[in-house]
Amino acid sequence: MLFGPTGSGKSATLNSLFAQLMAIHRPRLFIAEAGNSFGLFADYCEELELTVNKVSIKPGCGISLAPFADAHRLIETPAVMVSEEELSERIETEDSDEEDDDEERDILGELEIVARLMITGGEAKEEAKLERADRGMMREAILVAARAAYNAGRQIVTGDLQAALYQFAAEEARPEVRRTRAQNMGESLGVFMLGFLGELFDRPGDNWPEADVTLIDLGTLAREGYEAALAVAYTSLVNTINNIAERDQFLDREIVFATDEAHMITTNPLLAPFVVKIVKMWRKLGAWLWLATQNLEDFPNTSKKMLNMIEWWLCLVMPPEEVEEIARFKKLTAEQKAMLLSATKTPYCYTEGVVLVSRIEALFRAVPPSLYLALGMTEKEDKAARRAIMQAQGVSELAAAKQIAHQLDVARGIAKAAT
């Protein structure tokens, strides 16, 4: 977890960490972000002959995220079909039991969370209306939809789940209240089957190109009003990366999935439990989750279990109120708080921070190389400076960033000015 408020040098620090990571360990790197903060880093990797895949999620992008793509495993791994009532009883047991780190992946539980996100829109008042019987019916519908799609020889899409719920609504053997609830849930799914969201979530998904670096710009989904769609998209990204990790678990190459602006992702209280369900097994697959955020205030209390799984906390210079936000999720001693508050920074020079691990508590000073500092410059004046060089010299944005890096080297006294 890298935590750094606005202006703390988070992007530059991440660029430097990513470069060291790729140079030394060469994992398969996935970066999810909003705002194209790492577009220049991806261009830099491509210039160094690493394979790069850039994905931008926006209308007309042609991307399908297929949130229920793993449902076929429920059919390929036979399980005893149970009734809605039995499923709801199992849910109560699952919610109350402590999870074992060695347990197998709960695909049905994961897909239920996705369905709940879509049906409730991630709204607290809608989530509060859900009963255990509703969740049991969702799971039953997922199993029915998965069977229908599997028998048809295709991947399950959101429309299959809607059809299963409408089928339940038409079954006279079910109580009227359950039929009405099934109808309502089916209609709620319709939001994710129209327009841009239908393009993303109601089509079969394709395998991503093999690449050393995959940059996912969340684009339109990062805007206000798309919170539920963003959460569903993130679950699909996690599943996609998980499938690659499972496929390549016997290879010696690891996977790193880094999420910038993580506070945008985890605002939904259902998402942190979903991430925990999958990521807790990633160490066995050689996959690692990195989170970077400028705002812990938006992390709901349900994120505590996810954040407790974090081994390394890198906390860049921060004000007192942000230190208290860290204390919501991680117990801090008075000495640790004092250390966090003592960190300082000098723009374009260095940023101090604190590393908190089980065996290490230390103040550090991050001095990113000029190139990675230039690649991570995201402020408006920084972009304007690059643009001026691009227009004056007819060069690419990456070349302009390199020139700014040289200017920083000159200012730092480690290079001579061009004559």
Over which residues does each language-model region extend?
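C-terminal regions of RecA-like/P-loop NTPase motor modules
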Residues: 5-7, 299-307, 312-419
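P-loop NTPase motor domains
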Residues: 25, 39-51, 57-287, 345-349, ...
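Conserved P-loop NTPase motor cores
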Residues: 1-20, 29-32, 36-38, 55-61, ...
